[in-house]
Amino acid sequence: MKFSENWLRSHVPIQATRDELSATLTAIGLEVEEVTPLGESLGQVVVARIVEAVRHPEADRLQVCSVDAGQGELMQIVCGAPNARAGLVAPLALVGAKIGELTITAAKLRGVASNGMLCSAKELGLDSDASGLFELPDDAPVGQALAEYLGLPDASIEIKLTPNRADCFSVRGIAFDVAAACASEVVAFDAVAVAPVSTRSLAVELDAGKDAPRYCGRVIEGIDPAAKTPVWLAERLRRSGVRPVSLLVDITQYVMLELGQPMHAFDLETLHGPIGVRRSRAGEQLALLDGRQVTLDDSFLTITDAGRAVALAGLMGGLDTRVTETTRNVFLESAYFDPAAIMGRGRKLGLHTDAGHRFERGVDPALPPQAIEVATRLVLELAGGTPGPVVHAQLPEHLPQPVHIRLRRARIARVLGIQIDDADVVRMLRALGMHVEAVAEGWEVMAPSRRFDIAIEEDLIEELARIHGYDRVPTTLPGGASRIAMPSETQLDELSVRRQLVARELQETINYAFVDAALLERWQLTEGLVPLANPLSAELAIMRPRLLPGLVATLGRNAARQAGRVRLFELGKVFAAAADTGAAPGESQHVAAAVCGDALALQWGEPARKVDFHDLKGDLMALAAASGAQLEFQPSTQPFGHPGRSADIYREGVCIGWIGQVHPRLAKALDIDVDVIAFELQLMPLVQRTLPRAGELSRFPSVRRDLAFLVPDEVSWAAVSASVRTTVGPLLREVQLFDRYVGQGVEPGFKSLAMGLILQDNSRTLTDRDVDAVVADVVAVIEREHRARIRS
């Protein structure tokens, strides 16, 4: 954004110097890229009129001009500019004037005396145009100092705007920020409505919904086509990087630069029906102002006249309806278009216009009525004419609504680390154009409609920091007590679980937390599932209810690639739908393992064999021993497990998992042709542990007695061992199952269980009588409670 320093100061009275203003702009986020001083050395440059211009007798490209500079007599100036002619008003540098590094002196050019220099805009440092003399209006006062006439000295300031600051694509928008930073106030803006004189108007129809919710238009008739752009307006445009074209076009450009509202002027006589705003039709063609004929798709917004497209909304007008030097009747347009409807459309056609640049970032939706009044007043003042009524079409339901934000004192202090006085908070926010009301904990703030970037409390805090000054926010290192949690001695951490399993020659794998619904159906896990609203694919549409489906699938892929021994484990979350509708799904941490193939790595010391249930159970018991968990196993009825080789896992009477061989039918459905042994447990019940207590070591010897019982097939070792522990009490150090036998010598429906009892007392040596009494009690209890008999 480029603008005139004097123009900005006309909107916000400040005492800051140019350097201070530049520093302030950069400090508040409007980074100054370039400052170009204008007219600081024009003390001896005056307005002059060429009375006569004749060809130089010795040079075809030079002219000898008689110039009236208000000095009382005509001055002779030799000039080589192609536009030098009688009647032209242009700047004249008198003898002694310093133009840049050049000091003007009286001289002879090809033998003809020259007592000054007629200047171009570039030579004066006012513009880049060096094609000819700087042409001034015919009514410019001859002899007046040029600096006084042009309102110099001044400076052209160019700032770099971030995409969120669309409100600063106008002089007035910048003025609000400067006023807030310099503790000043923006000059009140006069947007008094111009009363209509005629009744002529054009109806407006909005057919683009939210893309074009507001459109203002006005007819002005009887404009003087010969009216010229006044020098003050042309200079403000020129110093803002816009070259003056014609009065009507210059007025629309001026309003855009001052207020931030792009406008367009149509030649009324080229319009033949009501004005419409609609989406373009695929294949529709339009001749643009730059002379190009473009073919549109259906993504553009168009301004239409009796159905035909006459302009690209928010981008560029049409060639057929443009204003010309003969235009006497115009239709002024001022509208609000949704940024999303304009964004990227210009790039499709290779267009980059000031209007499009503003609309795609967001223009104040409240501006169109004000802008059309300002433009009307300028047209009437500078070119005359008869205004009609303003036609104001809008779709209120699609206009952006004001945002009310609660700003808390405590939040300001917490985010910025400093306290800002209440009075300063209110002053800064109001200077930025915000409506502020005090409430108990702070303020209720409503951002102005031009500030699309303010939506939450943190946006307001950022504004305060920006205006208050980032340099006034102290640099402090983060502080506070360490929040590193102390490791719990009553819980085995996940790293320890991983290390235990790795020590058992298991390898960790990490699978997706999403699984295929078809896979879960094969596992018969179809209840309490949590589907994803936006899955990555149909095969990853369900949050996993167990780890095993994904883990076994991974094991199968490895086994299918000639991996003879696969041992995998995984720690991860599983998910279940909540019982209450609308509640968040439940999640818990599980640990699972799956193995197949050889039980032992390739070696020569032991014969090769396949892994079985007891191998993986041994791995699980080693993990349980690390936490001191006493696990119990009961026959399982899980449909995915082998009916005779799987068990539910209990701790303290609560089922916490499953272990066993995957059902052969399921393995076959998964294209796995080897036996798969697996377990899965809830992690938290497994890793909870009781702190060990130191006990007295007995100084007396222990005694071992071996017993073998014939027990019914349905009686488990867990039940038998529990009876033994209850019966023997503190004398029992350990009970071990060392043999299980079914076959010859054992009647059908029974099995042989052989156990070893290790007994010890802390106070004395046990005698044979003591041991025999304990054994007799054990035999009696097992025979009575489990319908067993001692095996002879």
From Swiss-Prot:
Broad EC category: ligase
Ligand binding (Mg(2+)): 453, 459, 462-463
Keywords: Aminoacyl-tRNA synthetase, ATP-binding, Cytoplasm, Ligase, Magnesium, Metal-binding, Nucleotide-binding, Protein biosynthesis, RNA-binding, tRNA-binding
GO molecular function ontology, one term from the record: tRNA binding
Reactions the enzyme catalyzes: tRNA(Phe) + L-phenylalanine + ATP = L-phenylalanyl-tRNA(Phe) + AMP + diphosphate + H(+)
GO annotation (BP), single: phenylalanyl-tRNA aminoacylation
Enzyme Commission number, as recorded: 6.1.1.20
Subcellular location: Cytoplasm
Cofactor(s) this protein requires: Mg(2+)
Chief location of this protein within or outside the cell: cytoplasm
Family, similarity comment: Belongs to the phenylalanyl-tRNA synthetase beta subunit family. Type 1 subfamily.
Quaternary structure (record): Tetramer of two alpha and two beta subunits.
Name this polypeptide is given: Phenylalanine--tRNA ligase beta subunit
Source organism (scientific name): Xanthomonas axonopodis pv. citri (strain 306)
Gene name in the database record: pheT
